Each structure stands twice: as structure tokens, then as C-alpha cells.
């Protein structure tokens, strides 16, 4: 990337440069909005690991807005769950741990997730499958010990 002019960079390349510049600036709090924008799936995982490692090792705080479920799962320690109707009547609840927050969010959507045993990524269970029904009965909508 360093050998290219900024004007010639792709969206994903620009995003990686922007993330590098953001984390290269000294701060006590990092506000990062949609770090997954323009990144492919492998780059999203890589970026998540880099961001998380940077925040942990620098002992800083980051507030990250992310709508990509997998990336949010990799990044989050705590989540803010919103309820209600977006842009009309929504409530932001107090931050909770990742597992609690994801369970609250997914219960509202009536969706269950498991962790893929080969790559450990989140996978949606088929609606009304045995696994889906077992997890719902146990109140475990997100990554249930497998």
C-alpha cells in the first residue's frame, strides 16, 4: 500500500489505511465506526484481531459501532443492545457482557447461533431444527458450549 497514491487505492485499501491512522494516533478513547466497511470476510477477521490486540496491549478503551455480526463477535467484550423501532422509538440499554447481550438480541430475533467446529465462526441454526429448538429451550441463543 505504501507504494501507491491514496487516490488509486481501493475501498478496502483505504479502510485499512484509515484504521492504521486511527490507531496510530495517541488517544485514551478510540471511536471506530464500521471498521468492516469495504473489507472482505478474511480482511474483517484480520482487522478485528489487530484492533482487539491493539486495544488490549495499549490498555485503552474503544467504542466500536459494527453491524457485521461476525466482526462484532470477534471485537466485543461488552455490547449495547437497542430495543424498539429504529429511528422512531428506540432504547439503548446499559452495556452488558458479550454472551448476555447477544442472547438478548438473538432472542428478540428468534435466531440461534452455534460455533462452527472447523473454523469457530458463528453459524445460524436452521429455524426449528433440533439444535435451534434445544438452544431456545435452554435460553442459549448464542454459542452454547460446543
Question: Where do the PLM segments sit?
Answer:
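Walker B catalytic motif
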Residues: 5, 32-36, 42
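Conserved ABC ATPase signature
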Residues: 5-9, 13
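Hydrophobic anchor residue at the start of the ABC signature
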Residues: 17-19
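A short, proline-enriched helix->beta-strand linker immediately N-terminal to the Walker B motif
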Residues: 23-28
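Helical segment within the ABC ATPase nucleotide-binding domain
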Residues: 44-58
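H-loop/switch region of ABC-family ATPase nucleotide-binding domains
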Residues: 65-67
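A short, surface-exposed alpha-helical micro-motif characterized by mixed small hydrophobic
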Residues: 72-74
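Conserved beta-strand-loop-alpha-helix hinge in the C-terminal portion
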Residues: 81-122
